[in-house]
Amino acid sequence: SNDTTADDAGEETTIIVFAAKSLNQVMEELITKFQETHPNVNVQGSYDSSGTLLTQIEEGAACDVFFSAAVKQMDQLDETDGLVVDGTRHNVVNNQVCLVTYKESNTEVTSLEDLNKASSIALADGSVPVGKYTRQALVNAGILEKADDVSTIPTATVSEALGGVEINECANVGAVTSAVAEGSNEVGTVYYSDTYGLEDRLEILQVIPYDLTGDVIYPVAQVQNPEAEELESTTAKEFIDFLITDDAKTIFRKYYFDTDVEN
């Protein structure tokens, strides 16, 4: 593999990476690993929900790499907006959605099937990928009625389908994780990876199978950044290539991501 031009010239460069909130912890370790072989590269990570990041890119925010928690946002950037650099898009990891509670909650809930027994549920809004996947799972489990686009199913409709249970609508998966870990809500749905580091506070009630949620693919791609110089652009490509190496996969697995995907 050829080292970056950045290192040959001793030139420093910065690449801007927009990554889904659920990638925050693993990305910090991945960036550190990448910098071992690219000491002159500064990787600037910005983390938020995939939908928010997509909007920022569409509104002209400078960005070199978009790492989304869902295919939907990447398709929008790629096919609708035409802002993805050809040939740079890869599926990186899969992530399982989990139903969680806090330790010693004594909840009666065991799975989605008896979710209506919860005193309260933390649930991400349908525009947030984990909220969309949860709605899809509830539709496939026969709890929610089908919709053309499950992400448009309002929180109130989910509550009604569960017999009027109180739902705390969250703006991103981090808010769901906090609400349950703190005991503000009895149960919630988060990614398996969100339970990393919270093993002593969260209990997984159910790892929701992919046949209910569908695949939870995280795609990455280089974003057309007119402000980027050539060095920044080639380095962005190298960072994307790094994300599908065995070294990177080992790190992803440590944070409970599923690397068994076609890159």
Sequence positions of predicted segments:
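Multi-pass membrane catalytic core of lipid/isoprenoid biosynthesis enzymes
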Residues: 98
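Exported/periplasmic ABC-transporter solute-binding proteins
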Residues: 6-32, 36, 42, 51, ...
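Active-site charged/polar residues at nucleotide-handling catalytic sites that mediate phosphoryl
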Residues: 60-61, 183
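Short glycine-biased active-site loop of nucleotidyltransferases that positions the nucleotide triphosphate
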Residues: 58-59, 90
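Acidic, polar ligand-binding/catalytic clefts
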Residues: 72-85, 90
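Ligand-binding clamshell of periplasmic/extracellular solute-binding protein-like
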Residues: 45-55, 62-78
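Sec-dependent N-terminal signal peptides of Gram-positive bacterial secreted proteins and lipoproteins
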Residues: 1-2
